[in-house]
Amino acid sequence: LLLATWHDLSDVTLAEALDERASFRRFCGFAAHEPTPERTAFVRSRRELVTRGLDRVRFDAVTRQLEAKGVMVRTGTLVDATLIRSASIRHDGEAKWAGHRRRKPTHGDTAQVATDRAAVLIRGVEVTTATVHDAAELEAVLPSQPGDVYGGDRRSAAGPSAFAGRSTEAVIRARGGPPQVVRSGTWGRPEALVRLQAHNAAVRRIRCRIETVFGTCKRCHGLRRMRWLGLAKAGLQVRLAAMACTLRRSVTLPHAAAA
């Protein structure tokens, strides 16, 4: 399933690639004479992963392994959310319509993501319907001792900026990390406005790194839209993409190569 995510393959093309490509066989541990799975095996595997919640277990295992090897360095955390189109407007009853500022409304789900600041590797991910507030799963995606937490300034379907409220900042402080979020306004003299603008610019300059993760997952790992129906399978797809993106990015890091 990771190979399918890395190469954006359907079940049929993945089965064909496993049968024909020696590199795919070696990666999956198949000998040259062994039969490889048919496409129906991937359908059953996904069903088992979703039913037993093993997609979360696998994602957490990857995160722990990278932390143990020193690839993920706790120098701060970036949090944000991105909207992903549903597989079908007509048949996906769990996905919802959501608009974002002046953009065209989208029928889909939201991936709420936390990454480390230094390497921008994904440390936490949750999937909700598109109408859920961007910071609704903040407590679930934030790691313990996250350091400075940089929140996005994207406005959610609920209206206000997602990470600038008292409740979300309380969640961040409870985890031991000071919030570094974009502020929407201030009272006082012009000097106060200048300080506010400088603060927001500094936060955006760091927070924008998480956009590269969203872009990579959508461009290279099949998250331009959901492949399967339902929120549970959407969560599986997003976690597979998160693992694929994190593993591929981790091998290019200088300290990972040194280790």
Locate the predicted segments by residue.
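Helix-centered, glycine/charged polyanion-binding patches within enzymatic domains
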Residues: 147, 153-156, 161-239
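Alpha-helical support elements that line or immediately flank enzyme active sites
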Residues: 1-9
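A short, flexible helix-boundary coil/loop motif
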Residues: 197, 220, 248-259
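Residues within the helices of the helix-turn-helix
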Residues: 12
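Polybasic low-complexity intrinsically disordered regions
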Residues: 6-7, 15-19, 28-175, 184, ...
